[in-house]
Regions:
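Glycine-enriched, solvent-exposed interface loops adjoining structured elements
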Residues: 1-135, 204-308
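Autoprocessing Asn-cyclization modules and mimics
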Residues: 55-67, 94-102, 131-204
Length: 308
């Protein structure tokens, strides 16, 4: 007999939840059952971001660097940056070069004497912020045009010393504050468009993930910051959605959801030990497969060779 000739098996959210409820010793019956299972699935996806590197969530990004600007937004939903380089002469075979840039801690960045020094960036500090926008905390005290690089607000008391603000639909980066005036403003950040804004427009803080480079990019050549990030897994969504998870992780996902669901249904507690064991085993199998397969070689540093 012939095989099906297809390899497209997948489950939508409704089928995933139904399977999980059956493993937990119950049945999917009500709309609330679906809602609570979807919530548990989203919580589990958040937990997966803490368990290791999920290779299917890798994405490459490129930022064109501006001379004199040292801080740049990274897309909201970024879990972490995995690799990063400074690229010069981009998109031309004879000139493109990717140069090393080292990630440093906040402690190391804080000890740099002159953070405004300009040259080719060789170090970067990544701030893993949550991407949330606060409620309005102040307002503009005067109208600004699309090209203004100084912005006056009614009160800067609640603003961080440097960072991003949202005015109407525009994200603006400011370098420092003096009094109630924001200076060294970079307009139209985070894929927004620089625009004019009227006096009394609301100002909110944006906690955007960001990289700060040192030295600050100079104008000797055109630089790009090229990075590979691990993004968040997409939310579970509605009942007809398929999950943002490769087929190899489907057994793990269903086993995990069954374990989460069993904690919330009558009679589910007695199944928890076996469901937890099944989830842990399924996770380990999937995680062991979800890894780099490239060869690796360890070479001792020259300073240690020959030392007794």
């Amino acid at each position: 007999m012939a095989t099906s000739g297809t390899a497209t098996f997948n489950l939508d959210l409704s089928e995933i939840v139904e399977e999980a409820f059956e493993r937990a010793g119950s049945e999917l019956r009500t709309g609330y059952d679906m809602r609570t299972a979807r919530r548990s699935l989203n919580i589990m996806f958040a937990d997966w971001a803490n368990r290791g590197v999920n290779m299917w969530t890798f994405e490459q990004g490129t930022i064109n660097l501006v001379p004199g600007l040292n801080t740049y937004p990274i897309p909201t939903g970024t879990v972490d940056l995995l690799e990063h380089v400074i690229r010069t002469g981009s998109n031309t075979a004879s000139t493109q070069a990717d140069l090393t840039i080292t990630r440093i801690s906040i402690s190391t960045y804080a000890t740099i004497p002159n953070k405004l020094q300009q040259a080719r960036p060789i170090q970067m500090w990544f701030q893993r912020l949550d991407g949330q926008t606060t409620a309005s905390i102040t307002t503009l005290s005067a109208t600004i045009t699309a090209t203004d690089t100084t912005i006056s607000v009614t009160s800067a008391t609640s603003l961080p010393a440097t960072g991003y603000i949202l005015v109407d639909a525009e994200t603006i980066y400011y370098g420092y504050i003096s009094g109630n005036t924001l200076y060294s403003c970079a307009r139209g950040q985070n894929n927004t468009t620089a625009a004019s804004h009227s006096s009394a427009a609301a100002v909110a803080i944006q906690n955007i993930p960001r990289v700060t480079l040192w030295p600050t990019p100079d104008n000797s050549t055109t630089y790009q910051f090229v990075y590979w990030r691990m993004r968040r897994i997409d939310d579970a969504g509605g009942g007809v959605n398929t999950m943002d998870v490769p087929f190899r992780f489907m057994p793990c996902m269903i086993a995990g959801l069954a374990y989460y669901v069993a904690q919330k249904i009558p009679g589910g507690m007695e199944r928890l030990p076996i469901l937890k064991a099944q989830y842990d085993e399924a996770w380990q199998l999937a995680a062991d497969e979800d890894r780099e397969k490239a060869a690796i070689r360890f070479v001792p540093r020259q300073m240690f060779i020959g030392n007794s």
